[in-house]
Amino acid sequence: MILKYSLLGNLLLLWMNIVNSVVLVGLYYGFLTTFSIGPSYLLLLRTRVMKEGSEKEVSATTAFIMGQFIIFISTYYPPLHLALSRPHTLTVLVLPYLLLHFLFFWNNHKSLFDHRSTHGNFIPNLSIQYVFLNNLIFQLFNHFILPSSTLTRLVDISMFRCNNKILFVISSFFGWLIGHILLMKSIGLVLSWPWEKMRSNALFRSNKYLVSKWRNSVSQIFSILLFITCVCYLGRMPSPIITKKLKESSKGEEKKKTEKERDVEMETISKTKKIEQEEERSVEEDLSISLEGRWNPYKIYETEEIRLNGKEKDEFGFKEKEKNELLWVEKSLLSLLFDYQRWNRPLRYIENDRFSNAVRNEMSQYFFNTCASDGKQIISFTYPPSLSTFFEMIQKKMYFRTAEKLPAEDLSNEWVSTTEKQRDNLRNEFINRIEAIDKGSLILDVVEKRARLCNDEEEQECLPKFYDPLLNGPYRGTIKKGYLYSIRNDSITSIQGSTKISWINKIHGILSKDYREFEHEIYKLDVKSSSAGIDDSSVSIGEFTEEAEEAEESRTRFKQFAFWGEEKEINSENQAEFLFDMVRADPNDQKISNQSIKIEEMKKKVPRWLYKLTADFDFEEEEEEEEEEDDEEEPTDDHGIRSRKAKRVVIYTDTDTDEDTDTNIINTTDSDQAKNSDQAKNSDQAKKSDQAKNSDQAEEHEMALIRYSQQSDFRRDIIKGSMRAQRRKTVTWEMFQTDVHSPLFLDRIDKTPLFSFDISRMMNLIFRNWMEEKSLKLKRKTSDYAGEGAKEEEHEEEKREYKRKEDKRQEDERIAIAEAWDTIPFAQAVRSSLLVTHSILRKYIVLPSLIIVKNIGRMLLFQFPEWYEDFKEWSREMHVKCTYNGVQLSETEFPKDWLTDGIQIKILFPFSLKPWRRSKLRSHHRDLRKKQKNFCFLTVWGVETELPFGSPRKNPFFFEPIHKTLEKKIRKVKKKGFFILKILKDNIKGFLEIFKEKIRWVIKIVLFIKSKVIFFFRLTRVFDPIPNNKDSKISNRIIHESPIRIGSRDWANDSLTERKINDLADKTIKIRDQVEKIMKDKKKKITESQKYIWQISKKRSARLIPKWNSFMKSFIERIYMGILLCITNIYKINVKFFLDSTLDSTKKILNRYTYNDETKEKDTNETNPNIIPFISTIKSLSTYTTTISSNSHSPIYCDLSSLSQAYVFYKLLQTQVSNKYKSESIFQYYRTYPFIKDRIKDYFHNYFHTRGISDSESKHKKLRNSGMNEWKNWLRNHYQYNLSRAKWSGLAPLKWRNKVNQHRTIKNNDLQKLDSYEEKDQLIHSEIKDFYKLGLLKSPSHTKKMKKHYRYDLLSYKYINYEYVKDSNIYGSPLQVNRHGEILSLSNYNTHKYKSFYVITINDCLEDKYIIDTDQNLDRKYFELRIIYFYPRNDIETRTSTDIGTFTKKNKTTKTGTNKKDLYIRIHQEIQTKQKEFFFDWMGMNEQMLDRTISNLDPWFLPEFVPLYDRYRTNPWIIPIKLLLFDFNGNKKSDLYIDPKVKSNQKERSNPKAESNQKEYLELENRNRDEKERQHQGNLISDTRNQKKDVGANSTGSDIKKRRKKKKFKSKKEAELDLLLKKYFLFQLRWGDSFNQRMTNNIKVYCLLLRLMDPSEIAISSIERGEMGLDVMLIHKDLSLPELIKRGIFIIEPVRLSTKWDGISIMYQTIAISLTHKVQHQTNRGYQAKKHIDENYFNGSIACHGGVRVNGDNNNYDLLVPENILSPNHRREFRIISRFNYRNRNVVNKNPVFFNRAKTNAQGFEKFVDRDKHFDTDTNNSLKWKVFLWPTHRLEDLACMNRYWFDTNNGSRFSMSRIHMYQRFGIR
């Protein structure tokens, strides 16, 4: 079995080696390159298809393989790669060959190569060589089928990673060869099929002509394909001949300027004869070039290169001019064929501020290179190019170094050994420092100090932090790059020269050895001017470039200094720089003699474009200067950049200056003729100048507008003549399309239905009207039940919305039509001609003809004609010519270039033909605005429209008035006829009624007579209705015979009454039957419903039976919780209220008589007069608390997949100190035993272990791999992530930010120590002075930074020791620890109510909200809550201090004062008042509580929420907004302003002693604050002596400056206005939309009125129409801003305050995580904390209950980091070195011991560690230092942690090379 496993392992190892080998990777990539087919495949296939012979096939295949091999070699050989990859080089080489190939060789190769002469001297056959050359050259072409650039990059990267590059190239070539053979074999099988068919065909075998014809056709097909391929390939490049020539920069001007400067320099050189001429010329030329380049940065450096390696130039460079003239012919020839300096790609020109010519985009910021990391060469993907070029230059100069390279293993071993030595040295130093502490040395002598560069050691005066080279980080600054023009010259006396002061690097000696001697004189640099522009970032002191000044006395006096940082200078010369080794000053003549090093500047010429491009509508100042200097040169309109499609439209031309221009022309011509002698030339020049001036004056007096095209211009800002990109993924399918779109996203963009595949959208388009009508009907039906007012409002809103959409749709249609006319060629000319034609026809032909016809018709109808009225109205109609946008010009003047730019014709007072003058036409729409618009525009079809390109409007019909009059007359006639018919109808109706009554009377008489006759004859008949009813019951009754004889009657002889009786009987029977039927149905339904209800109740009861028990339980619990607890709490509240009231009354009585007694109760408290409705807050917080408490002991299910680890890590770093782990974490941190005393440890251990709060025993745990599971376990132990699965899944991103982040752990300010600390003030102040003396505590900000470093350290330890994370915590600096504190017994405490472990205080849940830009000026317009200060209540009470979860101590000596547990808002020294009423009464904190009754109605039914309530009372950050706007005390006369100067003069009814104590306390606080502010307003140079003097009672003050005083308001309105402005501090003014439209309309009307002789009528009509606004005309130039705002011209838009971030700050915050300290959230920054620091803080690492008086918060620290003895740099270095195991990187199960001496000699630790029974069981956890594994985390986590571990304060030093992204190939 063992043999089998070993064989399997060997095979697996062999397979892994083969897979990772260079050969296999090369074969793989080579095989992939087979599918990138180029044009040479066509030639290769042609030889195989044509069957021209085996020799040609072999030559073609050989050339093909050789070309591919050259391509592979080019990847290894850079010159060949550049030659083949450069498109210009390849184009120049290939174009002549292609020209000869297609024009000459392709048609004549048979006659040239196949000609065989019978003579002896015959021409050899060159067809084989021709095929070889074709296949070889075409193989070098770029691929056009599957041109995978990604594949090429992968090949380059793979070769870059390989050690054996030649082996990789060869293997990739063989891989390609294998793929090529397989491809050719497969193609050969396909191509052999047509030849087999031809051979089997008898026709082809017999007819050779068909075979030759087929061969020629195939040859032509291949030639066409090859030609198309070459054209497509060359189409990607610019045309070499047909190209747009751009205007180059004016070289002539530069040459003239350089010549003038050199002439001036020649004069200065001739005057100075102290130095040799040749050296002086070289220096002057160098300086002139640098002066030319620095002083005028807009020039292009075309000067010659200066050679400094022993070769001297000719005198003043005249030979270079001749060389330039000779080279001009070559350059012109090259630029004629192909201009390599022009823009070949569709690049957009971005003009630079310093250089007018743009820099070529050929270099990137980062590129690949190898660098050393951990002793090995690995790849870096962000290697800076500047470092690489510098290293190459150094290697070239370092010729004395050996070229041999050590193996990689030796380098790694050497690095490991040196690192281990360094680690041992640091360990020894660290242990020696700890032993020194144990021996009793002062901590100040042991701690490693930071080195500073001092100016005076005795005075202890240091350099400013900006200029201290020994400091790094945020203290350093950056000198801005710029030009300094202020140089101090008055202080220099008898100076003949000047030199440059600069720092010399040691490396200059390696680069150059050219030493020369010069005599120079002292020149001092103005330090103030150089330090004027310094930013807060890392400094980079660059070179001081000097430049000459033209002067007679001084030879080389510098004119300016340019500071260049780490930026490459853009210059085409290798300037020389003289750096002086040493300077020796002579006080007599101030001359120096030194040696200078002449060094070539190490720089690279950055490629820049030769052309200075201008846009079409840019008017450059350089052209104007050229015209002024040389009048003969006419300005050229050769613009190189395409601007937005626009046209210049002249709207007004002023012709009043013609006379002035004529007189000026005459004067100029006379003066020119008088000055010059040659009359002919002068006259010509005068004419030219006159024409130019006339044209200039004409242009100056033209008022023009720029009309931009509405459609998108995809060519905007693209350089003319540059090649467009082949947009394979962009499609335009509409005439008017705003943007180009890709077909890939066709389903996501708005498109026409033709290209739409969305069926639902098409259905919506088809049935849109039907659906809208249906929805409107539904809305109306549902709105019927609402009120009438709501209906009308909804209807009006629908109408407005519909009108808005319709207007927008019509506007889009008009724009589309306008752009269509403007896009189609020659469309504007056609349209303009049609408009003019229609205008003439309408004005002079159509309308007069209609007038004539109308009047003739009136005369034929015998009516008076209206000739005068009609022609008068016709004469009012005006056809005004307008621009394409509608700007009115005049009736006779056409716009400039109106045939090409377009025209509009506006008809004012349009004529409408009427049947008669008295008739008033009414349009269909009763809109008053439309009545006022008595104008229209003319369309192409000759109809009228209201807007240009709008829909035609409906003109009133001529016969409409006639039709209306006829309708009125017909209506009148009908009305009269209806009246007559009504009268006749009424009369006829009355007659008929009388006639009917008469007939009834006659019938009655006849019936009466008939009845009498029947009765007379006694003929009767008995009526029996029962047999006639079928449904009735038949009764068998015996009918007795009547003694009376009954006669029979017939139905016909029956009377009317009998019939009625019969009918009534039938109806009653039917009704009775129906009632019976309904009763039966009802009974049946009732029985069925009863059965159904019984079934339902039976089912539900069966369901409810199992739930009955739980229901009863929950019901009983509700009753208990809701009723019983309420009763008990009410009883409790009443009892407490009674007790408190009695205690308060007794205390007041005692205070009246014992206010002079010094032994009073220390703890004081206030009552709350205004009760805050806190129930809602309690409910919300209780739900959150119960959720956490219920989940505290349940399994946690968290899904951290969507949460970035960097985000979590950043938030955890922001977690501040939480004291709820205060006591539990101390005794569980066993690794802190060496630094914790035994009695402290035993006390906490026994105390908590007896109560079972946590387990105190630890076990030996094996170090597991720090992976994702451990990371999640670490996160789960933080309660803010301890949520249930339902809660976790329900958290939205916004909720996560608003809730979880706000509920993160912060400092608990409620835990307070009450010991007095006054006894140790003197000792502490002396200690603080010592700390200031050493520079450890420079400022409070320095202390905060120290605390921040401790949090960084402890966070790292916390994660490394994640198995103990439940007990650990992140605390602050141990410098705040009090070693004199004692652990008291339980009997010393008043109360010891223990806080439940799951209860979270308000400090853990609510954090001060972060307000942006808290350091802004208070006079800015924004409202800040921190500037409002309050008084404490004057009625101060004393009580016994009780707290939940804290230990309080009752002191013997107490004094009266406010309890610091209740952090009331502090009193500012400048805010005092004499008023009682305040506008802002935040929870009664401003109220004078003298007349109030004492009450304490805190909600005690939930005791654990009392800290929440107290925190809510005292924390102004969580106050509702309503409390800012209402005065709950009923104060009506309130003012926002509180006068800080007026002191309180009221006589309070409070305790006078307490008030006096308060005043003394406030004065002390104010004095201390003034002292500490004076202390930290320091100058640039920090003086420790002044610091000693300024240190007062405060140990750590703040460097925050005093806030400015508020302005005093005159009235309440002004105060309210200021309050409004404070909310919005930024304003932006914008034009109102309505005003903008009105101004545009006014301008259009002005253009017309200026051209009219009598504009009154047009002006009045324009005002009536609403086109011209009088309010806009009355705008003056000197109107103030309030007036403009009042008129509605400007609108104020407030903008919220936001933070402006730059790239550096974003990078710093991303990589360098900065903690959000609580100092940023302090309520009153004027009140500063008092924090004291012990001397020997290592012996008392636990903050005991000593009297540390702080700003309401004390920190207890459970872990002390001993590394802080070292400096930060050594600390990080020691931590990194001690954590990594260099010999074996598999460190999962290996725990390197921190101290090597602990393994051999345990007594080394006994000196400073107290041994006990628990030490042996936990030694490993105390002494071992575990390894942090980097590769198990994401990149963002590495970036976050990398800032801390590797001391990268800024992001520039963070390199991705530390991440091993690829494994290097080994040499097999």
From Swiss-Prot:
The keyword Hydrolase does not apply. Residues 248-276, 684-700, 789-806, 1537-1576 have a biased composition (Basic and acidic residues). Residues 248-277, 617-643, 658-700, 782-806, 1537-1607 are annotated as: Disordered. It is a multi-pass membrane protein. The keyword Membrane applies. Residues 674-683 have a biased composition (Polar residues). GO terms for biological process: protein transport. Disulfide bonds: none annotated. Residues 617-636 have a biased composition (Acidic residues). Its main location: plastid. The chain crosses the membrane at residues 11-31, 64-84, 87-107, 126-146, 166-186, 221-241. Part of the Tic complex. PANTHER family: PROTEIN TIC 214 (PTHR33163:SF40), PROTEIN TIC 214-RELATED (PTHR33163). Involved in protein precursor import into chloroplasts. May be part of an intermediate translocation complex acting as a protein-conducting channel at the inner envelope. This is Protein TIC 214. It comes from Nuphar advena (Common spatterdock). The gene is TIC214.
